[in-house]
Amino acid sequence: MNDIETRDTGTKNDNSSEFNLSVKSHKRKRSFDDENLELEESREETSGGILKKAKTQSFSESLERFRFAHAGSNNEYRKTDVVKNSDTDNGLLKSAVETITLENGLRNRRVNVTKKSTLKASVKKSTLKKKNEVDPALLQGVPDYICENPYAIIVGLNPGITSSLKGHAFASPSNRFWKMLNKSKLLEGNAEFTYLNDKDLPAHGLGITNLCARPSSSGADLRKEEMQDGARILYEKVKRYRPQVGLFISGKGIWEEMYKMLTGKKLPKTFVFGWQPEKFGDANVFVGISSSGRAAGYSDEKKQNLWNLFAEEVNRHREIVKHAV
C-alpha cells in the first residue's frame, strides 16, 4: 500500500511539474505576445500613420529575439528586429552607400590615373610615329658652305631627318658636333656656334659638306652605290676648293667609302684615327670619330681629343698665314 501511495504521490508530483511548466510557458508566451503587441503599436506611431504593419513574430522568432536583444539605444543591432523605414536603418544604408561611393571614387581615380598615363604614352608614341612617317625621299638635303681655298673642309655622312627638316647641318640635339667644335677652339676669336651658324663657317676659313646629299633616318639606309657616287662628287669638290690644311672626316665609315673609291680596296685593319698617309683630291685627310649619339663605342673624351688635334693644326696654319701677310 505504501508502494501504491508512493506511486500515486509520484504521479501527482509529475503532473504538478508538467502543470507548472505549462503555466510558466504560457506566461512566457503571453509576455512575448504582449511585447509584440506593444512593438506593433510603437511601429504604427513612428511610421506617421502608415497602415502597413510589421509582420507578426512567431514564438520561436520572439525567443530568438530574446537571445540577441540588448538594453540600450535603438542603434544597437538586433537580429530579427529590423524595420526598413527606421532612421537607424536609413543611416546604416546611407553609410553603406557612402562607403561604396568612396571605394568607387578611389577606384575611378586609379583608373583615371592609368588612363592619363596611357594617354601621355600614346601622345609620345604618336609624335614619334609621326616623325618616323616622314618620307626621306620627299625631304631636301642641306646646302654646302665652302669658301675658296679654306683652311679646312668638314665632311659629314649625310643629313639626318632633323637636319633636313631644319635646313641646317648637324641639327639633331643628340649630336655633339657643334659642342665639340666649340670646345676645340677651331673657330677664331673663341666664337661658339650652333647649327644655325653653319652658314657662317666660311667667315672662319672653314667649309662644310656631306658625302651623300640624300637625307635619311640612318646611315644604314644609304646604298653602297650612292655612297661611292658621293665619294666621287666629294673628290671633285676637294679639287675645286683646295683646302690648305686638309679634310676633317667625321666618322670612320665615311673614310672607308672614300678610301675604297681611291684604291678599290677595303680600309686596312691597321687603320688609326687621326691623320692618314693617303691624300684625297690633293688634300690631307684627318679622320675623327662620329659625333652622333649612336657612336657610343667611344668616349666623348677621345672624340674631343681628336677634334683638339685637328684644331691645333688649323690654328697653327692660321698663325703662319697671318705672319706672312
UniProtKB/Swiss-Prot annotation:
GO terms for cellular component: nucleus. One of its GO terms (molecular function) is hypoxanthine DNA N-glycosylase activity. It holds the Pfam family UDG. Gene3D superfamilies: Uracil-DNA glycosylase-like domain (3.40.470.10). Residues 1-11 have a biased composition (Basic and acidic residues). Belongs to the uracil-DNA glycosylase (UDG) superfamily. TDG/mug family. This is G/U mismatch-specific uracil DNA glycosylase. It comes from Schizosaccharomyces pombe (strain 972 / ATCC 24843) (Fission yeast). The lineage of its organism: Eukaryota, Fungi, Dikarya, Ascomycota, Taphrinomycotina. The gene is thp1.
